Amino acid sequence: MHNDAPKLLETLWQLQKDPDFNAGDILLKTELSADEGQALQVQLLERWLNEGEALGGWKIGMTSGESRDALGPGIRPFGFVLASRMLPSGTDIPRAQLFRGGVENELCFIVDSPLGENATAESAQAAVRRAAPGFEINQKRLPPGCNAGVRVADNLSNWGIVAGTAVAAPADLKDLAVTLYRNPEDVDPRTEQAVGRIESAGHIDDHFESLAILARRLHDFGHRLEPDQWVITGAYEKHPFEIGEFRGHFNKGIGDVHVTLSG
């Protein structure tokens, strides 16, 4: 465990409760490994649970785009999602509640059966038969320049998940494509602006392999994937917070998800 672990944990906890908390320079001066950051993150989860929150699901990080391998080749840390922040499509979230951050289109899997230590891509596919179009709501609590292990300790910036209607998970997601649309409040509601479209191939790790890696890593830290948990496996298109509606469209029959940030 890192020498400053108690102080780091308290600082991270204060940021979880108030992202505008003045953390000083301890986070910028700290270098954490993936495992050190993960251990601190699990303690953050325990604090939330002790306050009466429930665990709702998980994310696996550093699987897509520029974040891949930020902690080293093949290292894929996890983050937790609070049940109170698992929100349905169409949710309206006050913009002021979120501080800094952005929305990211992510495929959201719903776990059907437990998955843990011996997970493989094949067993993961069998354990998560449903998938939904989703948004991850990311909150930037850390000062710029923190090392990747500190980002893990801060729960990989997760604030919550918005998910649409679940469908049978396609067996082959290699040609999944996701388009993000935005509709600022000062634009006619019938008019949307496409932010961008990203295809799975070459952008993101195999989803089912990511689920297996997540299950095995959770086992290393005393957890596993449980029925009805939501799991997100990596970002597609993203956009900074702004007032208005966002829509994500997922092909392959997965469908749409909506979230509004209100003033």
Task: Say what each PLM segment does.
Residues 224, 248-249:
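Hydrophobic, well-ordered secondary-structure scaffolds
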Residues 2-206, 212, 240-243, 247, ...:
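Catalytic-core "active-site belt" of small-molecule-metabolizing enzymes
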Residues 207-243:
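A conserved acidic, glycine/proline-rich C-terminal tail/linker
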